Amino acid sequence: MSWPQERTLLAHDFQSSSQGWLVSGDTGQFEPQFHAAGGHPEGYISHVDEALGETWYFRAPEDVVRALPAAENGTLSYSLKQSADQPGVLDDDIIIVGPAGRLSFRFATPPGTRWTPFAVKLAAGAGWRWNWNAPATQAQIRSVLANPTSLEIRGEYQTGPDEGALDSVVLRAGG
């Protein structure tokens, strides 16, 4: 879902590569597996959980992080799927970090075993949290987006071995 008047800043559709995305947080940092077909549409990236470490995330490459300042009041959207539909781990779905602090967001439902689209507005009132705690204000969102150092999208939703997949990442500027 996108909101009116939003200009696309970048889109990663994983048609020919992993486009610089990494996996972080399991037991280290890895390149995700690239799949040329089966995505939403065409290619996608995935990771099979080692079931040894903490919740793992897809970590955005520099071009995505550099585009975040222009995305204030815009949207971040993507599609996810997981290997099982079971009650899982409660954790942040999106994390954006910068010297000013940490923003996090949790969707109401996890992805299913088929491609599930997600979208969130990069603005106050959308459900963003500031430094693990309070609702984020627009000034706090602006301060983190002004100089971000990382963007991570959750890939793990189960305890134990599982697989998560990511596709169709789009960052749009606010109107």
Spans of features found by a protein language model:
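Extracellular carbohydrate recognition and processing domains
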Residues: 100-142
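Extracellular beta-strand-rich recognition modules
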Residues: 76-80, 149-155
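Extracellular glycan-recognition surfaces and repeat-rich motifs
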Residues: 13-50
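Bacterial Sec-dependent N-terminal signal peptides
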Residues: 1-7
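Beta-strand acidic-aromatic groove motif in beta-rich domains, primarily in extracellular
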Residues: 83-98
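Extracellular carbohydrate recognition
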Residues: 143-145, 156-173
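Extracellular/lumenal carbohydrate-interaction signature centered on repeated Trp-anchored short motifs
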Residues: 54-77, 85-88, 109-112, 141-147
